Every structure is written in C-alpha cells, then in structure tokens.
C-alpha cells in the first residue's frame, strides 16, 4: 500500500480539488500542535510544494499555503475565511473583545461566528443564557454579530454573502466600539 504524508495530502488536495478545500486541510494540520509543531508543518508544506514545482496545480497549493492559518478552529471557519479573502476581505481571526470573549472572525466591527449544529444540540438552559448574555454584551459594546452555520456556507454561499454585506452595513452604521478587539487576551 502506498501512502502519502499529511502535508503531501494537503498539497494534493489543493492541486486536485482547489484552494478552499486545501486551506481547510492545511489549517487542520496545525490544530492541536505546539507553535514549534505548527512551524514544522508549515515548513513541510512549503518543502512539499517546492518538490512538486512545475506540476499541475502547484500554484494553487502555494496560494493555499499563503492563506492557511494556525488560528482556525474549524474547517468551516477556514472555508469562510477563504471565501472572504476571495472577495477581497481580510478578516481578523480569533480576536478578543474584552477579557472574556473571543470571536471567530472580525471584519471591522462585524463579528462573524461559524456555529456548528452540535453546539446547540441538547444545550442546557444555562448555556443558552450564557450565549445570549455574551451576544448582548458584544452588541452593547458596538459590534454587529452574524452567525453562520456550515450547511448555509456549503449550500447557500450567495445567501451568506448577502447576509454578510447587510450585517457589515449595519455594523458600519453603529459607529465606534467601546471595547476594541485585540489579538491577545487583555
């Protein structure tokens, strides 16, 4: 049986299936790794791409590596971040708003949360209340919040983009936020 390494598989995903799938695959390699492990994986991906120079789809693999991120926490965050990048939008990832709340993606004052259905399955009342308080607090600080589900991103990308731009327009009308987001926990 012939096998490939995980980095080679991620590169081949770019070559044969496109940048979006490859970014999700590459991002998944970084999860659960130490910073040293993440750097090692980036180097392995780059070396694999270099070895395949001149082969079909290597340019896509290079682009996917540029777009890959050690911060992504789910394949659907990776996918939507890549879609945003294709639209010319550079969202910030895993930003802290205040000391208690970290958000998936941030575009100006628009918070974009990618929520899996499992998060809500059989959710206890206390958890629902905690989530509601979190969202209310974020809005009270001047942020607009957009929730997207994986099934929406996959099957209604155009609808997600329409909702994104509508939410961004609302966010821009809110004005300045009272608690700026930071990349580190304050």
Regions from the PLM with identified roles:
Residues 43-56, 97-111:
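Short, composition-biased local secondary-structure segments
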Residues 92-94:
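Glutamine-centric residue-chemistry signal
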């Amino acid at each position: 049986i012939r096998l490939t390494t995980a980095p080679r598989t991620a590169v081949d995903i770019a070559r044969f299936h496109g940048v979006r799938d490859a970014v999700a695959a590459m991002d998944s390699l970084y999860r659960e790794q130490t910073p040293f492990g993440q750097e090692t994986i980036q180097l392995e991906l780059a070396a694999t791409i270099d070895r395949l120079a001149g082969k079909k789809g290597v340019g896509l693999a290079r682009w996917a590596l540029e777009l890959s991120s050690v911060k992504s926490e789910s394949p659907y965050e990776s996918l939507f971040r890549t879609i945003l990048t294709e639209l010319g939008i550079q969202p910030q990832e895993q930003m802290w708003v205040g000391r208690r709340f970290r958000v998936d993606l941030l575009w100006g004052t628009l918070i974009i949360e990618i929520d899996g259905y499992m998060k809500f399955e059989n959710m206890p009342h206390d958890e629902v209340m905690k989530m509601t308080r979190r969202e209310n607090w974020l809005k009270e600080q001047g942020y607009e919040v957009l929730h997207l589900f994986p099934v929406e991103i996959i099957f209604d990308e155009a609808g997600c983009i329409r909702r994104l731009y509508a939410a961004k327009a609302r966010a821009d009308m809110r004005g300045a936020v009272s608690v700026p987001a930071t990349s580190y926990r304050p």
